[in-house]
Amino acid sequence: KVGMMGFSAGGEVVSLIAYDAIRDANSKDAIDRLNGKPNFQILIYPGPLGIPETVTADAPPAFFFFLNNDECCSEPLLKLTNAYRKAKASVELHLYSVDKHAFNMGNRSTYASIKGWPQRLTDWLGDNGCLKK
């Protein structure tokens, strides 16, 4: 399986690809005939660009991690989560109340919940068969 992961603006790039993977079945270029949609996506406090209003049931399974007090980024991801729910697409949401935007891997955070988020991601990857050899 091939997935995509993005933090902040990188999350916007993942969204643009995951929900608008354009392919041209009639292209002379073999690469352009392929579907570029990832098998799964991981959005960590993504920016608002590229977040669609709706998703379909075949949207890439998603892991979302962000902060409630992140002024730029929490509302669009809550809307996206609801779009996933309406489409009955696979989504896991981790919404935390503390810390600030750009906490990265959580190593510098003073909050145990933020420091532990990579393990939540590892659990999700395992539960979804993404770590099988």
Regions found by a protein language model. Name each.
Residues F63-F66:
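Short beta-strand/loop motif that positions the catalytic acidic residue
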Residues K1-D58:
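Primarily recognizes the serine-hydrolase "nucleophile elbow" in alpha/beta-hydrolase
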Residues R85-K133:
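C-terminal catalytic histidine-bearing segment of alpha/beta-hydrolase fold enzymes
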Residues E71-K79:
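Conserved alpha/beta-hydrolase "acid-adjacent" motif
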Residues A9, N68-E71, V98-K100:
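Acidic beta-to-alpha connecting loop that harbors the catalytic carboxylate
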Residues N35, S74, K115-P118:
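Non-membrane alpha-helical structural segments and their capping/turn regions in soluble enzymes
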